[in-house]
Amino acid sequence: MTSLVSAQRLGIVAVDEAIPLELRSRSTEEEVDAVILAVYRQVLGNDHLMSQERLTSAESLLRGREISVRDFVRAVALSEVYRQKFFHSNPQNRFIELNYKHLLGRAPYDQSEIAFHTDLYHQGGYEAEINSYIDSVEYTENFGDWVVPYFRGFATQRNQKTVGFSRSFQVYRGYATSDRSQGNGSRSRLTRELARNTASPVYAGSTAESLRGTSAGSRNQMYRLQVIQGAAPGRGTRVRRGKAEYLVSYDNLSAKLQQINRQGDTVTMISLA
């Protein structure tokens, strides 16, 4: 847990002091309601949810303990509501960042995690991508079947990388904001840092100056690749042609272009980052 003074300065008191919610066999109706709302808040990135968008059937099953909290999280993440809010409206890298935040409660640690999930979606589609987080060992160890996922990027936990703390500020911009109302629109927040394997600047609030690490220093020239992903051979039309963005160093540019070509994807733009 971060010290109170530091948490106040960084604007993370609400997250730092939050108590995880767990659905128990003897939970009251009010406690069940709190769990359901907490799942919507976490998985949907604190975005406004209209009454007609609620998953009433899944809610009913959870109230009757016919499904677990993990199952309810899965239902929300696989729903058309989640797809419309985060899948259809974001590039692939941003979508993966949000999946890490919503389902595992942290920011991605390195480029290999982004690459893994990009390839997983390309090969297995939307459901495989979502299920990979919820069925992971990391999810089980932190939330199990009955705890509502929560943002834990500012905590110190086993198997957690230190760089995750600073990168968390890029995907978390305050308790009162939503993941669809932040600045920079749908652009990925971590593409540059992950590509360079450097730490993000830490901002003390929305308009304060940042405490910069190596990401603010000079580096070798990076190139930004914008890519349209083609469906894997033999797949149905239900898998969309997604967009992705990569930051690649000059030394790795040729190899990355060859990899993109082998995957059947199309590079639409190469520019200096």
UniProtKB/Swiss-Prot annotation:
Q: Where does the CpcD-like domain start and stop, copy by copy?
A: 220-273
Q: How does it sit in the membrane?
A: Peripheral membrane protein
State the oligomer form and interacting partners. Part of 2 PBS rod complexes, the conventional CpcG-PBS rod and a photosystem I-specific CpcL-PBS rod, both of which include ferredoxin--NADP reductase (petH). CpcG-PBS has on average 3 stacked phycocyanin hexamers (PC, CpcA and CpcB). Linker CpcG connects the PC stack to the thylakoid, the hexamers are linked by 1 copy of CpcC1, 1 copy of CpcC2 and the stack is terminated by a single copy of CpcD. The CpcL-PBS has on average 5 stacked phycocyanin hexamers (PC, CpcA and CpcB).
Mutagenesis or variant effect for residue 141 to R? No change in interaction of PBS-linker domain with phycocyanin beta subunit (cpcB)
Q: Which residues form the PBS-linker domain?
A: 1-180
Q: Give the location in the cell.
A: Cellular thylakoid membrane
Top-level division of the source organism's lineage: Bacteria
Mutagenesis / variant outcome for changing residue 54 to E: Significantly decreases interaction of PBS-linker domain with phycocyanin beta subunit (cpcB)
In the record, the effect of residue 29 to R is given as:
Significantly decreases interaction of PBS-linker domain with phycocyanin beta subunit (cpcB)
- UniProt xrefs under PANTHER family: PHYCOBILIPROTEIN APCE, PHYCOBILISOME 32.1 KDA LINKER POLYPEPTIDE, PHYCOCYANIN-ASSOCIATED, ROD 2-RELATED
- The name under which this protein is listed is Phycobilisome 32.1 kDa linker polypeptide, phycocyanin-associated, rod 2
Tell what the record comments on domains.
The N-terminal PBS-linker domain (residues 19-157 in this experiment) interacts with the C-phycocyanin beta subunit (cpcB).
Return the similarity comment.
Belongs to the phycobilisome linker protein family.
Q: Does the keyword Membrane apply?
A: yes
Its biological purpose is as follows: Rod linker protein, associated with phycocyanin. Linker polypeptides determine the state of aggregation and the location of the disk-shaped phycobiliprotein units within the phycobilisome and modulate their spectroscopic properties in order to mediate a directed and optimal energy transfer.
Gene that this polypeptide is encoded by: cpcC2
One GO term (biological process): photosynthesis
An annotated GO cellular component of this protein is:
phycobilisome
Q: Which organism is it from?
A: Synechocystis sp. (strain ATCC 27184 / PCC 6803 / Kazusa)
Alphabetically list the UniProt keywords. Antenna complex, Membrane, Photosynthesis, Phycobilisome, Thylakoid
Effect recorded for residue 41 to E? Significantly decreases interaction of PBS-linker domain with phycocyanin beta subunit (cpcB)
Variant or mutagenesis effect after changing residue 80 to R = No change in interaction of PBS-linker domain with phycocyanin beta subunit (cpcB)
Signal peptide range in chain numbering: none
- In Pfam terms, one family for this protein is CpcD
Please tell me where this protein is predominantly located: membrane
Question: Could you tell me which InterPro entries the record lists for this protein?
Answer: CpcD-like_dom, PBS_linker_dom, PBS_linker_sf, Phycobilisome
